[in-house]
């Protein structure tokens, strides 16, 4: 186990790496935490493993409630987006199967990480959504991945309305592979990882890379396009800045539609 992290825990056991989000109560991603997740993924790439598990610490009430709103302001927006998207670029680069173990809310950036995982095991109390539009912004990763995972029309509806869905609906849409009672999360995880341990880690990497290539363009290319819109167009609008400011001031935003 590595002890060099403050907001996560990292361990490798029986050819499976586990990255545990440990920033209670809601695992809100700040820049430091996101960089730690990327570092742990990079460390996983150097290990002979068959899978990576992403999960929340038992003391946390959510898988993740998303990226810290206070880091969406002009002073930190570039660092924030770069640090968050580095997670997804690293996931694509290492090409190892990734399993999300979700118990509680996976919202905003938390839901985007779920969408990027190969297998999602969720408790029946879990909730999912990308409510960024209510703050006057949009979720760049979700605009790329959600249509691929759950279909174009439903993805558009979730992104454009900010709707939160329960685990049953997430399972029906294909965002979750397995929805189980909370006590069955770890047993279901053991069942899935047992299947992967019987396989070649190298072959799993090639299979995952082949599926990524089948999308027609890399996630890195798609993210670069979204970053340009987000940073150089959206974040220069009055409404994007008003939405973030209103959230931090705990009031309703006053939209100017510009």
Labelled PLM ranges:
Residues 2-4, 92-202, 237, 242, ...:
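Crotonase-fold acyl-CoA enzyme core
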Residues 73-83:
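A short acidic, glycine-rich active-site loop
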Residues 19, 54, 68, 113-115, ...:
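Hydrophobic/aromatic residues within transmembrane alpha-helices
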């Amino acid at each position: 186990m590595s002890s060099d992290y403050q907001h996560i825990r990292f361990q490798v056991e029986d050819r499976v790496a586990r990255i545990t989000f440990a920033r209670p109560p809601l695992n809100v991603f700040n820049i430091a935490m996101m960089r730690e997740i990327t570092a742990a993924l990079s460390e996983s790439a150097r290990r002979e493993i068959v899978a990576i598990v992403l999960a929340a610490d038992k003391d946390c009430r959510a898988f993740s409630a998303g990226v810290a709103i206070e880091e969406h302001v002009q002073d930190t927006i570039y660092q924030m987006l770069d640090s968050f998207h580095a997670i997804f670029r690293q996931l694509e680069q290492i090409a190892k199967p990734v399993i999300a173990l979700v118990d509680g809310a996976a919202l905003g950036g938390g839901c985007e990480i779920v969408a990027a995982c190969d297998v999602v095991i969720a408790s029946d109390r879990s909730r999912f959504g990308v409510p960024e539009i209510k703050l006057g912004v949009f979720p760049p990763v979700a605009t790329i991945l959600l249509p691929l995972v759950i279909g174009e029309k439903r993805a558009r509806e979730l992104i454009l309305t900010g709707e939160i869905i329960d685990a049953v609906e997430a399972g029906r849409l294909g965002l979750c592979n397995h929805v189980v009672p909370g006590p069955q999360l770890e047993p279901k995880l053991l069942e899935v990882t047992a299947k992967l341990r019987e396989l070649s880690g190298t072959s799993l990497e090639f299979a995952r890379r082949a599926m990524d290539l089948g999308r027609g363009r890399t996630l890195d290319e798609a993210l670069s396009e979204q970053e340009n819109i987000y940073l150089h167009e959206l974040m220069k609008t009055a409404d994007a800045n008003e939405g973030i400011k209103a959230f931090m001031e705990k009031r309703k935003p006053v939209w100017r539609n510009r």
